[in-house]
Amino acid sequence: MFSCFNNLGLDYCYQCMHGPEGCMVPSRQGDGGELYAHSEELEAKLRGLAKKESLEIEKSLENDKKTYGSHIKILILGGPSSGKSTIFKQMQIIHSNGFKTEQELIQYRGLIDTNIRQTYRQLVSGARVVGISLESLESLVHDINKVYAPMAADEFSIRTIPDVVEPLTAFWNSREIQEVYKRRYEFELLDSTKYYLENLNRISKSDYLPNEEDIVHSRKATVSINSIVFQYTGVSLLMVDVGGQRSERKKWLHLFDDAKVVIFVIDLTGYAKKSEESRTELSRFPNFFNEIGNDAFDMKVALKIFNDVAGSHALANAVFLLFFNKVDLFKELLPQVSLQPCFSKFAEENSYDNTSKFICDKFIRAAKPKKSVFPHFTTATNTENIKMVFRACMESVFKANSKATGLS
């Protein structure tokens, strides 16, 4: 059973490029024993994919150079579902034109419709995982499924929210689903679930077009290279998000050896989650599997990725900005889930101050001793927070050693 087909109804797996019969990405429910059943074949495919992606990245960077000329390059990297693309969208809102054209707004309206449909399906599935019966909601589920059942999970060409707003609102407000939501760390669920489902009446209006807050809460897997150029205090910055690159980083990271700054984003709630994306990360890199096992918490995977990236020769001269993201969700989760299962050496009270300091220290120690690393705690969906943090970050970067940054 492979989750990319069960949950999304896809013809091929975007993670390993196989069809249903040959997919190598195990479902969360599997024991992981099949993880490397076809490792040689997977590695061969990834080598070809890495070469293709390297050429695509190189072409994209060359086009940027021709178009924008000289600039300081900022690379966005990070752990699974950490908010990399959300940070990128915030930069577009704060420092560029944002999202204002009718075409952009209509596209995001469709994506938001899709995200709401995904959250509904995830909540129904999550109820089974945590053992909460939805029998009393059978009528509501039936009414919602009449609209949603014929549609693929990622289909957003048809607007459906106006047709389900009443039963979906009742579904969300039910005692059973609120109990399921409290245990959301036990199954896959979009971070934007609460935000969207509490705004259904507004989103369902016939003249609805998303605002910037709606847009930054939207979620779509990054499958391409995105870049943006903007001016900051008279300096031209090129920000590149390569979150959609699925092949081994060492095979394309050298293309960014001129990056002056790396923003590495960490999902703080990852200490309590073992997501499909983490398992996919492990399936691509056997050395990760050997070091931390196939059932690692997302934060352990992020820590290993950071250790790998921070030690890369290609980024030896880059300043690293650590964005410990989703502070708001992290604070909500702390009373329910201890940090100790993820980090066995943590033995203090599970307070925000204690846990955030412990996590921050873990990541800073994972970098080389002389590496310039500046930690910041963020809520990527909060535009004012990101504006303030980015200002502080750039002040740190501009003050950093001129040999390391090349910015003096």
From Swiss-Prot:
Which portions of the sequence form the region G3 motif? 237-246
User: Could you tell me the keywords of this UniProt record?
Assistant: GTP-binding, Magnesium, Metal-binding, Nucleotide-binding, Transducer
Cysteine disulfide partners in this protein = none
Q: Where is this region: G5 motif?
A: 378-383
What are the record's GO terms for cellular component? cytoplasm; heterotrimeric G-protein complex
Give residue ranges for domain G-alpha.
70-408
Residues reported in the UniProt entry to bind GTP: 38-45, 78-85, 201-205, 216-222, 241-245, 285-288, 325-328, 380
One GO MF term on file is:
metal ion binding
InterPro entries with a match to the protein in the record? Gprotein_alpha_su, GproteinA_insert, P-loop_NTPase
Instruction: Give me the ranges of the annotated region G1 motif.
Output: 73-86
Q: Where along the chain is Mg(2+) bound?
A: S85, T222
Question: Which GO BP terms apply?
Answer: adenylate cyclase-modulating G protein-coupled receptor signaling pathway
The annotated region (G4 motif) lies at 321-328
Q: Where is this region: G2 motif?
A: 214-222
> What family name appears in the similarity comment?
Belongs to the G-alpha family.
Main function: Guanine nucleotide-binding proteins (G proteins) are involved as modulators or transducers in various transmembrane signaling systems.
Relate the assembly described in the record.
G proteins are composed of 3 units; alpha, beta and gamma. The alpha chain contains the guanine nucleotide binding site.
Q: What is this protein called?
A: Guanine nucleotide-binding protein alpha-14 subunit
Q: Which organism is it from?
A: Caenorhabditis briggsae
